Amino acid sequence: DLLLAAGAIVMGKTATAELAYLGPPKTTNPHDHSRTPGGSSSGSAAAVASFMAPLSIGSQTGGSVIRPASYCGVVGYKPTYGLISRNGVLKTSEKLDHIGLFGKTVEDVALLAKVLIKKDKFDTATVYYSADGILEETKKGPLFEPKFIFYKTDHWKNIEKKSREAFEYFIKSFKKNIEIFDTPSYFKDIHKYHQIIHETDLANNFGLYYKKYKKKLSKPMQDAIVKGNKHSAKEYAEAIDFMKRSYESYEEVFEDYHGVLSPSSPGVAPKSLKSTGSAEFNKVWSYLGTPCISLPLLQGESKMPLGVQLIGAKYDDHRFLGVANWLEKECNN
């Protein structure tokens, strides 16, 4: 309704992974039809990459916006948790589900955010946050050259050779702006707690599907629901409590830096349609609820697109998009 009121023309619906989880749809990668477009927002990213639509909407619980954006070579933006209503979207996890936006440029997604960021009584997770001036601030960018932290994380070893070389060249090119930091120790706990919340919520939300249509569900979805039913209330409560404590530790970096950089994915889109790829570089930020964006700045194997992920502080999306726009323009100049 917000988009229609703003004058948008709705082109149609796009394909998503099974119940917005892991089961891949029929969508292929526009750059190479033998490769996955990523997921779960597969069609949303592919539609923008193939010029079927200038903008699109998806969702992210683990890495379902950032990863497809990286694989398809478009901009994918996941705002701070609670800025965009999830009313009408299939619920997989109350605490982890985010709405995400796709476009060709940072200014594209800022335009979409300007319309969609709004408090909604039908989604109690939404907060009052004014989107006034978000497009203007995005265009204006930071007042001075930003400084970044680059987290390689423990997953750096999983990045394919060509992609690792591309990231190392990127870091070298921005050496005056980037400092490489050791991965915070609590990141390992976040991956564990993200899994507990995600699986428990999948079991709660799709338990009826499992009972009635088990044979129609993919093996990964069946396994997630079974695991989710085994997590205790104590484990779930610990996972929720750790969200606040870990974010307080993370937030300290913004006293001296404008953002955190990391790979958007462990490489280019895998040459298979049986998987939507790995979200290992994304789950931390979905858990913390921070704004993050994938910028199509690099190329990996076979000249396939490769995204650089920028992460910001919660409820600082105006400034965050301005910094992202600066980085995009610096790389394109």
Spans of model-derived segments:
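Structural helix-boundary/capping segments
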Residues: 5, 9, 50-55, 61-151, ...
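Short glycine-rich, flexible loops that bind phosphorylated cofactors or substrates
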Residues: 18, 157, 268-270
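Short, surface-exposed loop/helix-turn segments at secondary-structure junctions
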Residues: 194, 238, 265-283
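Short helix-loop capping/hinge segments that flank enzyme active sites or metal/cofactor-binding pockets
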Residues: 142-151, 193-247, 251, 296-307
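Gly/Ser-rich catalytic/binding loops embedded in alpha/beta enzyme cores
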Residues: 1-62
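Small-aliphatic-rich amphipathic alpha-helix that forms the alpha element of a beta-alpha
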Residues: 249-252, 275-296
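Acyltransferase
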Residues: 161-183, 207-212, 236-257
